[in-house]
A protein has these predicted regions:
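A structural signal for short, well-ordered beta-strand segments
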Residues: 84, 117-119, 159
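C-terminal "cap" of GNAT-fold acetyltransferases
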Residues: 80, 145-169
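A short beta-loop-alpha structural element at the N-terminal edge
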Residues: 5-18
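Conserved beta-strand-loop-alpha-helix junction that forms the acyl-donor binding cleft
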Residues: 93, 119-129
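Conserved acetyl-CoA-binding loop-helix of GNAT-fold acetyltransferases
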Residues: 94-107, 130-134
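Conserved GNAT acetyl-CoA-binding A-motif
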Residues: 109-121
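Conserved catalytic-core motifs of GNAT/GCN5-like acyltransferases
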Residues: 68-71, 76, 118-121, 133, ...
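Acetyl-CoA-dependent GNAT
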Residues: 28, 32-91, 102-103, 108, ...
Length: 169
């Protein structure tokens, strides 16, 4: 059963928990090629402010997860295309937090005219692949041996969600 949560804009005051959840995801090994969470300044600079959202437990106020986007390119033709990251605290997984974050992200990006949300996910991260499929993402390809992590070449599944309301004209 999903616990009562609130999805709200990410705040600078969330930096500690956001980066801790990020680092825990990186430490688990199937979230990213990165091994170290960035500084808050680097995170804040890279992510679009209008689409940085946090999931907070209604009863405790604890930050349970977050989602944020970055532009995929500075070229104007890609103005409506973003790449997202979604991370959920290990203790909150399986409770609907990731689904709520993705739904809120879809709503915020569509309201801003974003027509495509992309993500690259390791094929071993089956929970994330299922989460994205349920949120309307589809696999558009597999980037084979995209990069090396800890001496092992890894594939990345490229997913996208095309808006049904933004970018249609």
């Amino acid at each position: 059963m999903a616990e009562p949560i609130t999805i709200r804009p990410m705040l600078a005051a969330d930096a500690g928990p956001v980066l801790a959840i990020y680092q825990a995801g990186l430490d688990a090994g199937d979230a990213s090629f990165e091994t170290q969470a960035p500084s808050w300044t680097a995170f804040d600079t890279a992510k679009l402010p209008a689409h940085r959202l946090a999931a907070v437990a209604d009863d405790t106020g604890d930050l349970l997860g977050w989602v944020a986007v970055s532009p995929v390119s500075s070229r104007c033709v890609y103005a409506g295309v973003v790449e997202h990251s979604v991370y959920v605290d290990a203790a909150a997984r399986g409770r609907g937090v990731g689904a709520a974050l993705l739904q809120a992200l879809i709503e915020s990006t569509e309201a801003a005219g974003v027509w495509t949300i992309e993500s690259g996910i390791f094929p071993e991260n089956t929970a994330s692949l299922r989460l994205h499929e349920r949120a309307g993402f589809r696999v558009v390809g597999i980037r084979e041996r995209l990069g090396s992590q800890h001496g092992r070449w890894r594939d990345v599944v490229l997913l996208e969600r095309r808006s049904t309301v933004a970018g249609l004209s």
